[in-house]
Amino acid sequence: SEIVINELADDDWRGRIIGIYGSAGAAGFALGPLVLIMTGTDGLLPFVVTAILVAVAGLPLFWLRNEAVTDGHDSHPSLMRIFRLVPDIMLLNLAYAAAVEAFLAFFPLFGIHIGLTEARSLSLLATFALGGVVLQLPLGWLADRMRRYTLLLVCVVTTMLGFLLLPHIVSLKASGPAFTFVLGGMEGMIYALGVILLGQRFRGVDLAAASVLFTGMWGAGTMLGPALVGAGMDLLGDQSMPYLIAAIYAVYLPIFFIARRT
């Protein structure tokens, strides 16, 4: 889906279009905790509801037409060549996936450690995802109005600082949900900007190859993030979760600056 959307999107509108796409994806993340709040976490009901939602989401595919996209110059692009062209974007998705998957996996455990109830933790996760739904639309518009790499840097730094502040704010009754809402929007835009920048740089089969590699980085991040953060929490305690996630983005930042200089 990202390949086709990126190929067909005009660059002047790319930020807004990918913002809508990202909001739709974030809506799915927001829906998950809400389903658990309504169904509970015991028994088969949450699995049945999830299966129904997946089936409903697939229905529009029956009405899609088979549209060809333009070809690139190389019919057999090298993934290594693609990586060398945009290592910062590929490693961005690795870092993003590692961070967001670790957060989703361990936030309930972190919440218990700081005294949150299960329902409160799930509602904050839903609020975090809702921020990705709502804020990617204005941030996507902003991506069409300013330098996209600058906006990416702002999102990464803001997200890193947000996780450093999370333990001090998240348990507050009013500001906690507002904080997680903004944090979810800023972090969600990191992924969207990665997709936008790939579409800005590549076309045709090169875009397809870049998107495949980008997705592969996501998969690697989803495996590495929870494993590394979980190991860190075993050593440092459950309260270390947000600091370990912030460290993931801190490790990425030098890669961003080195790539921008070359």
Predicted regions and their residues:
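Intracellular juxtamembrane helix-capping segments at the cytosolic ends
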Residues: S1-A9, M189-F202
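Cytoplasmic helix-loop-helix junction between adjacent transmembrane helices
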Residues: S1-S23
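Helix-loop-helix hairpin linking two adjacent transmembrane segments in secondary transporters
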Residues: Y21-F62
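A membrane-interface helix-boundary motif in multi-pass transporters
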Residues: M38-I52, A231-Y249
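Helix-to-loop junctions at the C-terminal end of transmembrane segments
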Residues: G40, L135-R147, M233-D234
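C-terminal membrane-cytosol helix-exit motif in multi-pass small-molecule transporters
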Residues: A51-D71, I255-A259
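Structural signature of the two symmetry-related core transmembrane helices
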Residues: T150-L165, A246
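A late C-terminal transmembrane helix in Major Facilitator Superfamily
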Residues: V205-D234
